């Protein structure tokens, strides 16, 4: 049972680590896109800051 469970457990942990890494990459990309979009609109930078403070 131990020999059967250990490779299965290893594959599951690596799979969950891959999912976590992919989620982190997507989160960072969305933050970068949001930040660049906010900075590209210089006249709306104040409104963007107000949204952050209210949130």
Curated annotation (Swiss-Prot):
Its main location: host cell. GO terms for biological process: transport of virus in host, cell to cell. It is a multi-pass membrane protein. Keywords: Host membrane, Membrane, Transmembrane, Transmembrane helix, Transport, Viral movement protein. Pfam families: Plant_vir_prot. It comes from the Viruses. One of its GO terms (cellular component) is host cell membrane. It is found in: Host membrane. InterPro entries: Plant_vir_prot. Belongs to the carlavirus/potexvirus TGB2 protein family. The three proteins TGB1, TGB2 and TGB3 are required for virus movement. This is TGB2 protein.
């Amino acid at each position: 049972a131990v020999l059967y469970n250990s490779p299965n457990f290893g594959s599951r942990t690596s799979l969950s680590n891959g999912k976590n890494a992919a989620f982190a990459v997507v989160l960072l990309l969305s933050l970068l896109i949001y930040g660049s979009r906010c900075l590209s609109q210089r006249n709306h930078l104040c409104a963007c800051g107000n949204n952050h403070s209210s949130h």
